[in-house]
Amino acid sequence: MVTVSTAQELADALAAGAQDIEVRGAINGAPGFTLPPGTRLHGGTLQFGARGVRLTSDNTLEDITILTADEEAAILNDTGVADLGTLTLRNVTTRGQIVILAEDRVRAGHVQAENVRVITADVRGRFHRPHGFGVDALQGGFTLWNRQADPEVKLTAELLDISAGTEAQPVYGSGIFVGGHGDQDGHGDGGTVHVTLLRTGEVHTDGAIPARTPDLISGGVFVISGATVDVVQSTGPVTTYGPNDMVLDNWGSVGTWTATAAVTSHGPSGIGFVNFGELDTLDVRAPIVTTGNGARGFNLYDGTLRDARFQSIRTTGDGSIGIQISKPMGRLAVDGDVATSGGEGLSLVKGVQMTLKAIALSITAGGSVDALAIGGKLASGGTNVVTLEVEGRSGEVSITGGVEATGTGSVAVSIGDDAAIDLEGIDIRSPE
């Protein structure tokens, strides 16, 4: 092991081919450098003015802090390497983006990340953005992305305890971004990423997208098309602050997604959880709260979903639907209430700003629910809104606290001519 404490000593160690380098203290002003294959770098703090550490193959970064400008990449990879081997990040803190890409010559690799924290980053200026469902998506402070069109190119990963941003300094862009190659419709059609476990800590993001922009979004935790994640565990609170900032978003394929801490959106046209991809089981064991106009709680826009359970969902903005189901799904359960307090307002829908009303639960003509169980109540408080709107179908229904509308000109239930739902025995309350 070689110990270094100055930029020159670090450069000398790299030039000499040292395979195990310990940084003692803080090294400021070093130019960005490439870590040779098989090299381990650990300890201390590195301060850069531009790009930081470029990984090649079988590298380890451990117990280290890497700082650069928010707009730069603190950790990136050499895309001229065919096989990344195993890139290990353990107990790593950065200011600036962590970005691992499969492009150019990269065709394989595994990423093992444990206790990784991006203090803040600004990725709004990145040229490459995945596109789907009428929008581009901003990269994340932590980004793992297979951009190769060839489906034979495969990355794998285990990502444990990844955090991004703070309440005082959110990441500008998405937070944690995992994706493969997708087509313009948002469906995977090339290189893939397979993650066995994605476990996230605290995440704070602000895409800083101008209000009413129709074709750009970000996500706090974002599984992009071309990514398969066996298990997602959102163990820390995830909060987004700006327009079009989704909190939890799936375009890919996820086995089980569990959230055990608050899911919160403070910007217009944000969504607590939105699904466009394949998702077997969703279990949100903490409140979903949105406060912006057009900011929905949960939306099954597209794809598949077998089972979803929520603790509670509350929206306060105009046009902020609590739950909207636009595709067939299995069981939908909410332990507590689904409550909205807004009226009519604009909301982003697949790349178009549309006028919506703050319905508590909407099952559209293309949507269906095999079994619906609400442990609390469905409630709306806005003017001229509907609490429960059904144009599709629902199987067995249980709403323990009933369906309630309290706003002027509002009604508790609206059922379309071709809809199918049995509300017998359920308490329905509309304003007199």
Protein language model features and the residues they cover:
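Acidic Gly/Asp/Thr-rich repetitive segments characteristic of extracellular carbohydrate-active
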Residues: 1-24
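Leucine-rich repeat
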Residues: 6-10, 99-100, 246, 321
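Extracellular beta-strand-rich solenoid/capping regions of secreted or surface-exposed proteins
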Residues: 15-16, 28-42, 46-85, 96-106, ...
